[in-house]
């Protein structure tokens, strides 16, 4: 399953979020990926807890985001 967060960010802010996604995924030893979506960029993780940690980073950085239902 993949747990995704769609963020509305671009430029340096998006680069920063990519770095944070890498860091939280590396710490949890799981895979992740980012892909463009109609409403922004989706960051998808293999673990719901990592998605929650990434959402906390978005809140801290004041980035607009939405979570998606898990996909297989």
Where are these regions (language model features)?
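Conserved short beta-strand edge segments in small beta-sheet-based binding/regulatory domains
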Residues: 30-34, 61-72
């Amino acid at each position: 399953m993949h747990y995704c967060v769609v963020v509305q960010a671009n430029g340096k802010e998006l680069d920063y979020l990519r770095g944070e996604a890498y860091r939280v995924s590396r710490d949890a030893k799981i895979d992740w990926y980012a892909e463009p979506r109609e409403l922004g960029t989706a960051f998808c993780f293999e673990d719901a807890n990592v998605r929650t940690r990434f959402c906390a980073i978005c809140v801290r950085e004041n980035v607009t985001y939405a979570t998606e239902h898990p996909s297989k």
